[in-house]
C-alpha cells in the first residue's frame, strides 16, 4: 500500500510538473480551441477587405499579410519607413505580385509622412498662395511618389498575372489608385519645379534629380492648348457646391488634372473702367472666340522595360498628356486599359472663377465690369470631326444658365463622340439685331480660321439651342430677312432724308441676312417668338428704363451719326 500510494503521489506530481512546464502553450493555458470565431457586420467585412492607407490611414489587410509571410510584421516594419521598404524589397519568400503591390502601398505610406506644402483654394477655386520656390523636402517627396508609381506599374503589367486576369480583384483597384495618385502628385511637383526654374534639359526632356521625364508626342487627334498653364490643379482636390448637381468621371488609368490657362476673354470681353472713355477708333480689336481656359487632361507615366528588372530600374519614364474627350483607351504593354477622365472639373472650375452671374447683371444695367461684345467659348479644343452644338443663353444671363445641361451633355458618351459644345456669352443689353449680327460674324471667323475649305464635319449640321432671348437670336440665324426689315422701317418710321440714306447704307448689313448654312437644327427653350406681355406692364417698363446700352453701341451710333452728318438729337 505504501508503494502504491507513493506511486500515485509521484504520478500526480509528474503531471502537475508537466502542466506547469507547458504553461506558455496557449492551448493548455486557455483550455480552449486554437481557433475562435466572431461575427462581423457586412460593413465591417467590406471595410476590412477594402480598407487601405488611403481610405483608413492604415495598411491594407493584403499588405499586412505579406509582411507576416515575410516575417517583417514585427521588428523592422513595426514603424513605417525606408528600412521596412528595403527589407521587403530583399525578401525572397513572397510572390512578386504580393511584393510589388505591398511595396507600392509602403512607399505611399512613406510619401504621405513627408511634409508637403498645403494646397488651399478660395471659393472661386483659385490657389490662395502662389508657389515661388521649392521646399527642402521637394526631392525626397518626388522620389517617393515616383517609387509608388513605378512599383504600382510593375505590379499591374510585369508580375505573374495580367491586369485582365485580376480584373475583379479589389487589390488591383487599390494599386491602380496608388498609381493614379502618385502620377498626380508627381505631375504637380514637376509643374511646380518648371514654374520655379528648377527643371533642366531640353524641350522634350525634363531632368529633376535622378529622374528624367521624356515628354511623349501629343495625340494625333488632340488639339489641347500647347501654352504653359498658369496653374495645374488636381481634379480630385476640388469639391463643387451650388447649382451643379453632379460630377461626371470615367474610372481608369491616369491622373485627372485641370490645366488653367490665362483667359484671353477675361480681359478682352470685359470693359475695364480705365477704358470707359475710349472711342471706337481707339478701342483695340480683340478675338471674339476662345477655348474654355481650364481644359481637363489625363496624365500617364509609362515606364519602359522588357522585364520586371528593367522596369524597376527605369529612371526615364515617358510623360503622356491625353485629351480625355479624344482618347478613351490606351495600350500599355499590349493591354488595352481605359483612360481615366473627369468631364466636370475643368468646366465647373471655369464657371466658379468666372463671376458670370454678377457680370451679366452689371452688363444689363450698364455697370462697370460688364461685357460689351459677344464672345464664343469652346468647351473643348476644336475637333474637325465632330458637329457643333451651340448654346445661346437668355436675358440677364450667362453661360452659367447651362451649367447642368452642358455638364450632362459632356458626360454622355454618344453625344460626346458626336458633338463638341460651344457657348455664346453676349451682353443682353445690346439690341437683338446687333447681337445677332455680331454672332454671325464670330461664327464666320471661327470657321474661316479652323476650316477655310468648309469641308470638315464641324462646319456642317450644327445644332443651335436657344433659351429665351437666345432662342430669338437662334431663330434669326435660320431666317431670311430679304429687304423686309429695311423696307418696313422706311415705310413706318419718321426719318429725315439723311437718316433714310444712313439706314440703307449702314443699317442694311445688320438688318439683311440669310439662314446660316452650317445650321441644320434648332432647339427653342421658353422662347417668346411672339414677344411677351410682361414687357408692356408697368414692371416691365420700369425695368426697361434701368437697362443701359453698352458703351460700344453708343460709340458706334455716335460715329455713324457723325459720318452721316446727323444731329445726335435726331
Question: Regions from the language model: what does each represent?
Answer:
Residues 372-375, 406, 436, 440-443:
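Short, well-ordered alpha-helical scaffold segments within catalytic/effector domains
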Residues 12-23:
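Bacterial N-terminal signal peptides
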Residues 25-389, 398-404, 420-423:
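Flexible, membrane-associating and regulatory peripheral segments of lipid-active enzymes
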Residues 403-419:
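Short amphipathic alpha-helix adjacent to the substrate-entry channel of hydrolases
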Residues 112, 116-187, 191, 196, ...:
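Serine-dependent carboxylesterase/thioesterase catalytic core
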Residues 2-14:
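Bacterial N-terminal signal peptides that target proteins for export
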Residues 382-384, 414-415, 457:
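Intrinsically disordered, low-complexity regulatory regions enriched in Ser/Pro/Gly/Thr
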Amino acid at each position: 500500500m505504501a508503494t502504491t500510494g507513493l506511486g500515485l503521489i509521484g504520478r500526480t506530481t509528474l503531471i502537475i510538473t508537466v502542466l506547469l512546464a507547458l504553461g506558455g502553450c496557449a492551448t493548455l493555458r486557455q483550455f480552449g480551441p486554437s481557433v475562435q470565431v466572431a461575427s462581423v457586420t457586412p460593413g465591417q467585412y467590406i471595410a476590412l477587405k477594402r480598407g487601405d492607407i488611403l481610405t483608413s490611414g492604415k495598411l491594407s489587410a493584403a499588405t499586412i499579410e505579406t509582411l507576416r509571410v515575410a516575417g517583417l510584421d514585427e521588428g523592422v516594419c513595426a514603424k513605417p519607413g525606408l528600412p521596412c521598404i528595403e527589407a521587403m524589397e530583399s525578401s525572397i519568400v513572397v510572390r512578386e505580385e504580393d511584393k510589388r503591390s505591398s511595396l507600392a502601398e509602403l512607399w505611399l505610406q512613406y510619401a504621405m509622412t513627408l511634409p508637403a506644402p498645403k494646397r488651399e483654394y478660395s471659393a472661386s477655386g483659385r490657389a490662395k498662395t502662389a508657389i515661388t520656390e521649392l521646399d527642402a523636402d521637394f526631392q525626397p517627396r518626388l522620389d517617393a511618389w515616383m517609387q509608388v508609381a513605378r512599383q504600382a506599374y510593375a505590379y499591374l503589367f510585369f508580375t505573374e498575372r495580367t491586369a485582365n486576369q485580376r480584373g475583379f480583384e479589389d487589390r488591383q483597384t487599390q494599386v491602380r489608385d496608388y498609381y493614379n495618385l502618385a502620377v498626380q502628385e508627381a505631375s504637380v511637383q514637376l509643374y511646380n519645379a518648371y514654374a520655379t526654374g528648377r527643371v533642366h534639359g531640353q524641350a522634350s526632356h525634363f531632368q529633376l534629380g535622378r529622374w528624367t521625364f521624356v515628354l511623349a508626342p501629343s495625340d494625333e487627334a488632340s488639339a489641347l492648348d500647347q501654352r504653359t498653364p498658369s496653374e495645374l490643379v488636381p481634379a480630385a482636390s476640388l469639391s463643387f457646391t451650388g447649382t451643379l448637381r453632379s460630377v461626371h468621371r470615367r474610372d481608369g488609368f491616369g491622373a485627372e488634372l485641370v490645366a488653367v490657362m490665362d483667359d484671353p476673354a477675361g480681359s478682352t470681353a470685359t470693359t475695364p473702367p480705365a477704358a470707359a472713355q475710349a472711342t471706337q477708333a481707339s478701342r483695340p480689336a480683340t478675338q471674339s472666340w476662345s477655348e474654355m481656359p481650364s481644359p481637363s487632361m489625363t496624365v500617364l507615366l509609362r515606364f519602359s522595360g522588357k522585364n520586371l528588372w528593367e522596369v524597376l530600374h527605369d529612371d526615364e519614364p515617358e510623360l503622356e498628356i491625353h485629351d480625355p474627350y479624344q482618347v478613351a483607351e490606351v495600350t500599355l504593354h499590349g493591354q488595352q486599359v481605359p483612360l481615366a477622365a473627369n468631364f466636370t472639373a475643368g468646366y465647373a472650375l471655369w464657371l466658379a472663377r468666372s463671376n458670370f452671374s454678377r457680370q451679366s447683371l452689371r452688363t444689363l444695367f450698364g455697370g462697370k465690369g460688364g461685357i460689351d461684345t459677344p464672345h464664343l467659348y469652346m468647351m473643348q479644343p476644336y475637333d474637325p470631326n465632330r458637329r457643333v452644338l451651340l448654346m445661346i443663353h437668355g436675358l440677364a444671363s450667362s453661360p452659367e444658365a447651362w451649367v447642368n445641361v452642358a455638364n450632362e451633355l459632356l458626360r454622355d458618351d454618344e453625344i460626346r463622340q458626336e458633338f463638341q459644345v460651344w457657348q455664346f456669352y453676349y451682353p443682353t443689353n445690346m439690341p437683338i439685331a446687333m447681337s445677332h449680327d455680331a454672332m454671325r460674324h464670330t461664327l464666320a471667323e471661327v470657321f474661316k480660321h479652323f476650316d477655310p475649305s468648309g469641308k470638315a464635319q464641324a462646319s456642317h449640321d450644327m445644332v443651335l439651342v436657344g433659351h429665351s432671348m437666345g432662342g430669338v437670336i437662334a431663330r434669326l440665324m435660320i431666317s431670311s430677312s430679304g429687304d423686309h426689315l429695311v423696307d418696313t422701317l422706311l415705310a413706318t418710321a419718321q426719318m429725315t432724308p439723311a437718316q433714310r440714306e444712313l439706314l440703307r447704307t449702314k443699317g442694311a448689313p445688320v438688318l439683311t441676312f440669310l439662314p446660316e448654312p452650317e445650321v441644320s437644327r434648332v432647339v427653342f427653350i421658353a422662347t417668346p417668338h411672339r414677344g411677351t406681355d410682361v414687357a408692356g406692364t408697368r414692371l416691365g417698363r420700369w425695368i426697361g428704363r434701368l437697362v443701359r446700352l453698352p458703351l460700344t453701341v453708343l460709340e458706334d451710333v455716335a460715329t455713324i451719326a457723325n459720318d452721316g452728318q446727323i444731329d445726335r438729337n435726331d
